[in-house]
Amino acid sequence: MKHEILLLGKIKDSFIAEGVEEYLKRLQHYTKVELRYLKGKGKKGALLSTEQEGELLLANVPANAFVVALDVQGKNLSSEGLAEQVINWENTGTRSVCYLIGGPLGLSPSLLARADLRLSFSKMTFTHDMVRLLLVEQLYRAYTIKAGEKYHK
């Protein structure tokens, strides 16, 4: 199974970029994870509207992918719950899972309507860069739980 994370713009903080790279390296042992950075700004550096961001993200979703939208109003899963979800995807033959992380204004209604799962990490607010790190860490944790390894305590 392949996990693809669609992102608007590059990671700005080097310490977060290093953390993301570390977890991507660790995940190679279990599964394929690809980050795709999309240009999140329009002409002259202006931020795109939520609808424009949604259209850009949706246009880049692979065909037949299971779509997970990271949304503060989404479903809260424990780490074990995410591991169970990964197992379920594998058992049902899901080949591609695509995670969508929107810009600072959130996700468009059309994008949320397309999502097969709306996932929330917390009711708290995080920077979009931090959500990227949290996502790859939680995927790594899910795979170690699935493998019965000791990373998860």
Curated annotation (Swiss-Prot):
E.C. code: 2.1.1.177
Binding site for S-adenosyl-L-methionine: L70, G102, F121, S122, K123, M124, T125, F126
Subcellular location: Cytoplasm
Location (main, coarse): cytoplasm
PANTHER family documented for this protein: METHYLTRANSFERASE, RIBOSOMAL RNA LARGE SUBUNIT METHYLTRANSFERASE H
InterPro entries: Alpha/beta_knot_MTases, RlmH-like, tRNA_m1G_MTases_N
The UniProt record lists the keyword Amino-acid biosynthesis: no
CDD domains in alphabetical order: RlmH-like
UniProt GO MF annotations: rRNA (pseudouridine-N3-)-methyltransferase activity
Record's GO cellular component terms: cytoplasm
Protein name: Ribosomal RNA large subunit methyltransferase H
Quaternary context: Homodimer.
Keyword rRNA processing carried by entry: yes
Catalytic reaction(s) noted: pseudouridine(1915) in 23S rRNA + S-adenosyl-L-methionine = N(3)-methylpseudouridine(1915) in 23S rRNA + S-adenosyl-L-homocysteine + H(+)
Similarity section: Belongs to the RNA methyltransferase RlmH family.
Gene expressing this chain: rlmH
Function field: Specifically methylates the pseudouridine at position 1915 (m3Psi1915) in 23S rRNA.
Domain of life where this protein originates: Bacteria
Transmembrane segments: none
Keywords (A to Z) from UniProt: Cytoplasm, Methyltransferase, rRNA processing, S-adenosyl-L-methionine, Transferase
